[in-house]
Amino acid sequence: MEPSPLSPSGAALPLPLSLAPPPLPLPAAAVVHVSFPEVTSALLESLNQQRLQGQLCDVSIRVQGREFRAHRAVLAASSPYFHDQVLLKGMTSISLPSVMDPGAFETVLASAYTGRLSMAAADIVNFLTVGSVLQMWHIVDKCTELLREGRASATTTTITPAAATSATVPGAGVPSGSGATVVPATVGSVRSHASSRASENQSPSSSNYFSPRESTDFSSSSQEAFPASAVGSGERRGGGPVFPAPVVGSGGATSGKLLLEADELCHDGGDERGPVVPGAGLRRPTYAPPSIMPQKHWVYVKRGGNSPAPAPLVPQDPDLEEDEEEDLVLTCEDDEDEELGGGSRVPEAGGREATLSISDVRTLTEPPDKGEEQVNFCESSNDFGSYDGGGPGAGLDDSGGPTPSSYAPSHPPRPLLPLDMQGNQILVFPSSSSSSSSSSSSQAPGQPPGNQAEHGAVTLGGTSSGALGMPGGPGGTPGGTGSGDGNKIFLCHCGKAFSHKSMRDRHVNMHLNLRPFDCPVCNKKFKMKHHLTEHMKTHTGLKPYECGVCAKKFMWRDSFMRHRGHCERRHRLVGGGGGGGPGPGGPTGPTLPLKRESPGAGGGSGDEASGATPQSSRRVWSPPSVHKVEMGFGGGGGTN
């Protein structure tokens, strides 16, 4: 080993770099993770700058004559609607329905790049429409929350200091002597928001634009106290939707602008307090919905059972407390499957549970008023108990169906009748009660041998036995007729009701002016599939309708029906004028194998004329008088 070099002073010099020992190698299993959280926002900001400058934009969107340029990747990642348009259909130019506001769409398009959305309070409905069409559910949920909040702010009341603690949520921290303006503490106004949808590609018609809780009376709910742990849990109770807590802002109310974060999908479950309006005069402007929005059309669910009057609510187990407003729910999305699948359980105030099913659902045109009896379109008559030989409602559970284990009369005298999948009422009665009940449609399987139940589908009528088609009523027959308005539980925002969800969705597409059915030949778009089927006949030249009298073919059914009526009438007139023709009971025109002939074919030999049958006499298209002259010439030729 060479000695280390010495300096002139005799000190050892450092070794050269090439002679230094190599660094120790890192372990093979060690992995270094580096995170750059600012890259995501910087990337979106850069893409937004490119969009504003028109760089690298590969798709154009047209809204009411205005054109917007954007990036396909960003649109497909932010909207399921654009995902289907640019990926599945490969479109580079997209035309949106004219119902959308161009200004609102421009703001929503910018929010896809920035994650921020700024809107005026008066334009929330326009943003709600844009979010519904584009299936951007976080915007729909936020706009729905703001609309509910704006409507609830109009019903706020100034309460006295003595009642301040009873109207607010316990633990809210409001001083008893402050005299502040407090929003009435209801379950619908203090629950946190929990958005639940069946899928990302859900139809916009299934969106809950409004909650029925704002139109209810707050006078009774202000006297009941709810613990803070009973709200804000974000869970569904009783199958009803959980509504967000309206938070009345203090800073944005004065400027008239609402600044929203697009990625704020739900509230944190931290401090759950009753919303208190900061200040005396700061309130959101009252929202007046247009005609296409729902006007207090909600579905009312009535609790079944003959339970005694509930005791006054006291703080107890949060899961057992229920407000009287839980009776108002919306039938949409996955709640329909829960109701059709046997009903859901709603805990009542006293700790008991009541079964809710589709038979308990009825449609209201106005919110329920306290002290006013609601008309139940699904109730039976008072003499319904005569079918089972027991008390009223015997053999029916809370949902209106037969129960094998209990046939005791324990229900009110006007029980609810169940509905089948098509929305028809089902009458339930024992087969051994009367002779008329033996003519029912079928027996329900799984019933006790001595008390088998039969049922038949009837239409909804009045509350009398004759209107329900019961034999006991005057002129009542099984399957009586009546109006079926009670079966239409699927509501549109314009006020129309439908008995099936698919019919309601198709009707909503008409509102949105959507034309999803394209012609592959001429690219013409149609709203209905059968319209496209009829349109395809113009390209194929198919004429499927043929007249049985003159063998003429038609492409359209209405033209064929109009021609056939005229053709048959002319044949009857021609056939009735000839002597020896068939009477009114003879064969009609469509059943005769006739062909069109010229008028000159009527003359011929005597054998032809004398032996002419009624069928051959109808071949000439002429009035009856001319027809007689032709037959006379033919007869003369035959005798000569």
Curated annotation (Swiss-Prot):
GO biological process, one term: regulation of transcription by RNA polymerase II
Biased composition (Acidic residues): 318-327
Positions where Phosphoserine occurs in the chain: S203
UniProt-annotated stretches for the region Disordered: 191-244, 308-327, 332-482, 571-640
Keywords: DNA-binding, Metal-binding, Nucleus, Phosphoprotein, Repeat, Transcription, Transcription regulation, Zinc, Zinc-finger
Comp. bias (Polar residues): 192-210
Pfam families for this protein: BTB, zf-C2H2
Tree of life domain: Eukaryota
Residue stretches spanning the membrane: none
Biased composition (Gly residues): 469-482, 574-588
Zinc finger (C2H2-type): 490-511, 517-539, 545-571
Record GO cellular component, one term: nucleus
Major place of residence: nucleus
Xref: PROSITE patterns: BTB (PS50097), ZINC_FINGER_C2H2_1 (PS00028), ZINC_FINGER_C2H2_2 (PS50157)
MF terms in GO: DNA-binding transcription factor activity, RNA polymerase II-specific; RNA polymerase II cis-regulatory region sequence-specific DNA binding; zinc ion binding
Residue stretches making up the BTB domain: 57-121
Compositionally skewed regions (Low complexity) per UniProt: 431-442
Subcellular location: Nucleus
Coiled coil ranges: none
Family under the similarity heading: Belongs to the krueppel C2H2-type zinc-finger protein family.
Entry function: May be involved in transcriptional regulation.
Protein's UniProt name: Zinc finger and BTB domain-containing protein 22
